[in-house]
Swiss-Prot record:
<comment type="similarity">
    <text>Belongs to the venom Kunitz-type family.</text>
</comment>
<dbReference type="InterPro" id="IPR036880">
    <property type="entry name" value="Kunitz_BPTI_sf"/>
</dbReference>
<keyword id="KW-0732">Signal</keyword>
<feature type="disulfide bond">
    <location>
        <begin position="31"/>
        <end position="81"/>
    </location>
</feature>
<feature type="signal peptide">
    <location>
        <begin position="1"/>
        <end position="24"/>
    </location>
</feature>
<keyword id="KW-0646">Protease inhibitor</keyword>
<keyword id="KW-0964">Secreted</keyword>
<feature type="disulfide bond">
    <location>
        <begin position="40"/>
        <end position="64"/>
    </location>
</feature>
<dbReference type="GO" id="GO:0005576">
    <property type="term" value="C:extracellular region"/>
</dbReference>
<dbReference type="Pfam" id="PF00014">
    <property type="entry name" value="Kunitz_BPTI"/>
</dbReference>
<feature type="domain" description="BPTI/Kunitz inhibitor">
    <location>
        <begin position="31"/>
        <end position="81"/>
    </location>
</feature>
<keyword id="KW-1015">Disulfide bond</keyword>
<dbReference type="GO" id="GO:0004867">
    <property type="term" value="F:serine-type endopeptidase inhibitor activity"/>
</dbReference>
<feature type="site" description="Reactive bond for trypsin">
    <location>
        <begin position="41"/>
        <end position="42"/>
    </location>
</feature>
<comment type="function">
    <text>Serine protease inhibitor that inhibits trypsin.</text>
</comment>
<protein>
    <recommendedName>
        <fullName>Kunitz-type serine protease inhibitor B6</fullName>
    </recommendedName>
</protein>
<keyword id="KW-0722">Serine protease inhibitor</keyword>
Length: 84
């Protein structure tokens, strides 16, 4: 397969993954955790998945500790946990 064909295939797979919703059975359990700012005193803008609203929302992270429901971008949150 040519490199152009591989790029097209990769693009189609990426699009399919973006458009396929994540069911609650496929969602990692840490997506259900409440956001935790952690024990440090930083003020980093981060994203967490909110189970009740099915949306990725902003919270402020202290910089250490916390839990895995903590993403740098909305896209990363959506790809991992689903949501809007």
């Amino acid at each position: 397969m040519s490199s152009g064909g591989l790029l097209l295939l990769l693009g189609l797979l990426t699009l399919w993954a973006e458009l396929t919703p994540i069911s609650s059975h496929d969602r990692p359990k840490f997506c259900n955790l409440a956001p935790e700012s952690g024990r440090c005193r930083g003020h980093l803008r981060r994203i967490y998945y909110n189970l009740e609203s099915n949306k990725c929302k902003v919270f402020f992270y202290g910089g250490c500790g916390g839990n895995a429901n903590n993403f740098e971008t909305r896209d990363e949150c959506r790809q991992t946990c689903g949501g809007k």
